[in-house]
Amino acid sequence: MSIEQVDTLVVGGGQAGLAMSEHLSNCGVSHLVLERHQIAERWRSERWDSLVANGPAWHDRFPGLEFSEIDPDAFAHKEMVADYLVAYAEKIAAPIRCGVAVTTVQSNIGRPGFRVETSEGLIEAVNVVAATGPF
């Protein structure tokens, strides 16, 4: 079985994982983002139906992408936030793989880096970023 090699592995494809992906790309760092479900899954399936963003649309956004179809002073509904995060991942061309669960992360013994077990096989990474859970 071959082991995939990456410089930096980002675990999680939500707000934090996408923000990290953008910064790594801007710095020229080769990386891969793994998301066990779909982008922004928790916004879709683990939030109250009535949830809205905690700030107005003009504020709660990433650089270079406005919320569409909403007044800038309005508060985006959870589905709108999830759709926005998908659009942002596409905009920045995030190198993301959805449907891949990370099961174990271990430090390499005697050399730098990490050995990461996933639902699709092994990955060795120099750096691992945990971007799971709330932003």
Please report, for each region that a protein language model flagged, where it lies by residue.
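A conserved short coil-to-beta-strand element within the FAD-binding core of flavoproteins
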Residues: C98-G113
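Conserved Rossmann-like nucleotide-cofactor binding loop
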Residues: A16, Q38-I39, F135
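Short loop/edge segments at beta-strand edges and connector loops
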Residues: I96-V100, T118, T132
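Glycine-rich active-site loop/strand segments that organize a redox cofactor
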Residues: S30, L34, E41-A82
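N-terminal Rossmann-like FAD-binding beta1-loop-alpha1 element of flavoenzymes
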Residues: I3-V33
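Helical element adjacent to the flavin cofactor pocket in flavoenzyme catalytic cores
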Residues: E79-I96, V100-V102
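Short hydrophobic core segments
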Residues: L9-V11, V116, L122-F135
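Short, flexible hinge/linker loops that cap or flank conserved catalytic cores
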Residues: S2-I3, L122
